A protein has these predicted regions:
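Short beta-strand to alpha-helix junction loop
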Residues: 75-79, 124-143, 200
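Helix-loop-beta segment of a Rossmann-like dinucleotide-binding subdomain
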Residues: 114-134, 175, 267-271
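C-terminal helical "tail/cap" subdomain of flavin- and related membrane-associated enzymes
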Residues: 367-424, 432-518
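Predominantly flavin-linked oxidoreductase catalytic cores and closely associated redox partners
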Residues: 147-287
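Extreme N-terminal leader/targeting segments of oxidoreductases
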Residues: 1-17, 35-36, 47-48, 60, ...
């Protein structure tokens, strides 16, 4: 439950709600709202419905379902334990559907070698997750959504703009619905933008004379080279390290999937031209072979080539405080909110987008419970302001921590490419605030970065710290919470301070370049 919002404030009231986008976040948001009694219509521009998993099977979803509006639809994905935890509490039928489609239930701590983690303990179940390839996962979520009363999904409906009341002096523009291709007007008490990282909400608002939302935007700076595999034995490879591992010039992701499939991703800086050779499957495989903790994940049948993704942005959008300095902190519009990636998005290599999106969706559901339908229609500004307050307090710190880590990792990769060896060690994944992009403040000036590196290094030597590091990585706690526990900061720094820049075994940059002939 979110700050200031409790079950005792909820009362069953009904609003007409339009959710834009039938991806993971859109359908999850729609189900949460429909189960509270709201009448929810989801508009999705892609026309094709997912194949029924029970009838067609997961391979049909993987091979035949086209989602042209989702650029990363067949790229590697994983669901974190934070997502599983929320789904188990809020929408457990989704987990059942994923499991029924062949998605495994895994304990990410138990997958580590026993010397790293020790015997499993009470409480280690928090590291469990349920995951699948993105098309299979979306098909499972869609199957559950079809069974939710009060929820209708309309596919093949392209939204082109917003419906709004005539401008009124001193009041924010009141959104009343959307316009669809062909001029169809669809009205609602509330429009929820779940269009993802490519959301055109800012342009739609500008087109009706409203201020654009205040935005922070910059190139994410990473490029991803991913490949899917299928097991020859039906078993997943053994894990020798955490899913995300950092090395000189690259990071490596090893992600379990459904039905004996998995994926591996090599992530580099987009400016690192010499590593663009990783687009070639033979060179990609030659690189992977040089990392002994990852090599077992090569032992499968490749079911894709090397899929590359680049050009992503880190972006944060706020509907309270637009880009008009005269308007100050007034809402840019009422009757519309943005959830998940449509609100803020960042580097996907940490796998946090679905979890943050579900936290955000639950926040919207709780705010609507608090203010009731009278607040939605009678005091729309209250809804926008309250949702902004809750987002800033409970969701934005997750985004800021991820952005901080991205900036630090980019600085490391820039140092690797320059050959100066600066920037700290491998690992990390927690904290908050801002660090520098390439050309910004050095990592040596940020003690939080050194603490994050020490946390990872200490996790290799201490079973308690291994749990703390994994909990931070999986969004189950924060680095600040870890370091305020009695004796933990001293323990981490004793074991991890001064560790090698990259403590996991693997090639240095020159050895990597030689392996791929770059």
């Amino acid at each position: 439950m979110l700050p200031g919002i409790g079950d005792d404030t909820w009362r069953c009231t009904v609003a007409e709600i339009l959710v834009l986008g039938a991806g993971l976040n859109g359908l999850s948001t729609a189900m949460l709202l429909a189960r509270d009694g709201h009448q929810v219509t989801v508009l999705e521009r892609d026309p094709a419905a997912p194949p029924g998993l029970a009838e067609a099977g997961p391979e049909q979803a993987w091979e035949a379902w086209e989602r042209r509006g989702v650029s990363q639809f067949r790229l590697p994905h994983v669901m974190l334990p934070r997502w599983r935890e929320l789904m188990e509490r809020e929408l457990p039928e989704v987990l059942g559907e994923v499991l029924g489609a062949g998605g495994p239930r895994l304990n990410l701590l138990a997958m580590l070698p026993e010397p790293r983690r020790g015997p499993l303990r009470a409480g280690d179940e928090r590291f469990e997750t349920v995951t699948a390839r993105r098309p299979v996962l979306e098909a499972a979520v869609a199957a559950v959504a079809e069974r939710v009363p009060g929820l209708v999904v309309r596919r093949g409906v392209a939204v082109t703009g917003l419906l709004a009341d005539p401008p009124a002096p001193g009041r924010a523009t009141r959104i009343r619905g959307v316009l669809a291709a062909g001029g169809q007007a669809l009205r609602a008490d509330l429009v929820v933008d779940c269009c993802g990282r490519r959301s055109p909400l800012g342009s739609w608002l500008a087109a009706i004379g409203a201020p654009r939302p205040a935005e922070e935007r910059e190139d994410c700076g990473f490029v991803y080279y991913g490949r899917h595999f299928r097991s020859r034995t039906g078993e997943l490879p053994r894990a020798e390290a955490n899913m995300l591992q950092h090395y000189d010039s690259v990071s490596v992701l090893t992600l379990p999937g459904d039905n004996g499939t998995w994926s591996v991703v090599l992530t580099t800086a987009s400016r690192d031209r010499r590593l663009r050779a990783l687009r070639d499957p033979d060179r990609w495989d030659a690189a992977l072979a040089r990392y002994p903790l990852v090599a077992p994940w090569r032992d499968g049948e490749p079911i894709t080539g090397v899929d590359a993704m680049a050009g992503l942005e880190d972006r944060h959008r706020r509907l309270v405080a637009g880009d008009d300095p005269v308007a100050g902190d007034d809402p840019v519009a009422t009757g519309v909110v943005a959830v998940g990636d449509a609100w803020a998005c960042t580097n996907p290599s940490l796998g946090r987008g679905a979890s943050i999106g579900l936290v955000h969706a639950c926040a919207l559901r709780d705010v609507l419970r608090e203010i009731g339908a009278g607040g939605i229609s009678g005091d729309p500004e209250k809804l926008v302001r309250r949702f902004d307050e809750v987002t800033v307090a409970a969701v934005e710190p997750l985004y800021r921590a991820t952005l901080w880590f991205d900036r630090g990792r980019l600085a490391e990769l820039a140092a690797d490419a320059a050959g100066d060896g600066g920037g700290g060690g491998g690992g990390g994944g927690g904290g908050g605030g801002d660090g520098g992009r390439e050309g910004g403040p050095g990592l040596a000036e940020d003690p939080r970065w050194a603490a994050g590196k020490a946390l990872f290094a200490a996790s290799l030597a201490d079973q308690d710290v291994a749990r703390e590091y994994l909990a931070v990585s999986m969004l189950l706690t924060t680095a600040d919470e870890v370091f305020t526990r009695p004796g933990m900061a001293e323990r981490v720094m004793r074991l991890g301070a001064g560790a090698a820049r990259y403590p996991l075994p693997g090639p240095d940059r020159q050895e990597l370049l030689a392996a791929i002939g770059a």
